[in-house]
Amino acid sequence: MTEQEFAAKAAKTVKQIVNAIADKEYERIASFAQIDSSWVKPGQTQKEAFLEFGEWLDGQLAMWTEDEEREFVVDHFDESCLDDIELEEDKSFVTYNPTNSGEELDFWFEIEFNMDKNEQISVTFNVNI
């Protein structure tokens, strides 16, 4: 796989993640990505961990909505919010700066991509608060 093909696949995956978050379909993310182990409790499935992440995120957005007296949501994917993908031999990394009505939120998403010898890509999602 060329670097360009890898970068295109990575960007497509980030788009899927961000759009699932914007649509509040947190559980769906588990079908194409893992959540960082820091979000997973013992015995918890990836789907359950993504749902818990969604509860946390919804709580943050609700708190800001109440404090600012305007609605806070995560916008759908915007390519301009995607930083350049740091390509390495078998592990790559990218950050995505989510927005609310085009305004950056106070956290960002970190996505790590690992490629095995068969060129299969595994994806790990995290949030930097």
What does each model-identified segment do?
Residues 99-129:
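Short beta-strand edge/turn micro-motifs at domain boundaries
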Residues 37-55:
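Short, charge-rich amphipathic alpha-helical segments embedded
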Residues 53-106:
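Surface-exposed, charged secondary-structure patches
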Residues 25-36:
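Short, well-ordered alpha-helical segments enriched in acidic and aromatic residues
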Residues 1-19, 23:
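Short, low-complexity N-terminal intrinsically disordered segments enriched in polar/charged residues
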Residues 14-21, 33, 54-57, 61, ...:
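Amphipathic alpha-helical interface segments used for dimerization/assembly
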